[in-house]
Amino acid sequence: MELDIKAIMERLPHRYPMLLVDRVLDIVPGKSIVAIKNVSINEPFFEGHFPHHPVMPGVLITEAMAQAAALFSFTDDDGGLKCDSAKTAYYLVGIDEARFRRPVVPGDQLRLEVQAERLSRAICKYQARALVDGQIVAEAKLMCAIRSLEA
């Protein structure tokens, strides 16, 4: 199942400049998600990282993988919205074994591949990787917490 930017924005609270997923190519319920981020020279972080040699910060590549994981968690088996995203927070609470293999530069298309390792109502663990042109540029184990915003 695919998600366009409208469906992504229904599920994630992130907005420019922190929305780092442009399209979801596939979701296999309970298993995995594949999404993309088109990296443009117009990204605000390129202004200072680095002006004469623009490179996407690794922390933002990791955030893009975490946003893909959140989209996976907020999408039910039929492709619908699993919960009210306005009343639910999805926090990145752990990053293990993060590796950055090569720079991501303007013009690249990040392919975000996230596999579920453990899913529960409160904590989810994932194996994530980002690829450009079929080559792994980053990978990490992610742990995310799902919290209700209603007190």
UniProtKB/Swiss-Prot annotation:
Keyword Lyase attributed: yes
Annotated GO MF terms: (3R)-hydroxyacyl-[acyl-carrier-protein] dehydratase activity
Active site: 49
Entry-linked CDD domains: FabZ (cd01288)
Domain of life assignment: Bacteria
Subcellular localization: Cytoplasm
Coiled coil regions in record: none
Gene Ontology terms describing biological process: fatty acid biosynthetic process; lipid A biosynthetic process
Enzyme Commission number: 4.2.1.59
Enzyme class: lyase
Role description: Involved in unsaturated fatty acids biosynthesis. Catalyzes the dehydration of short chain beta-hydroxyacyl-ACPs and long chain saturated and unsaturated beta-hydroxyacyl-ACPs.
Entry's family note: Belongs to the thioester dehydratase family. FabZ subfamily.
Protein name (database record): 3-hydroxyacyl-[acyl-carrier-protein] dehydratase FabZ
Protein's organism: Bordetella petrii (strain ATCC BAA-461 / DSM 12804 / CCUG 43448)
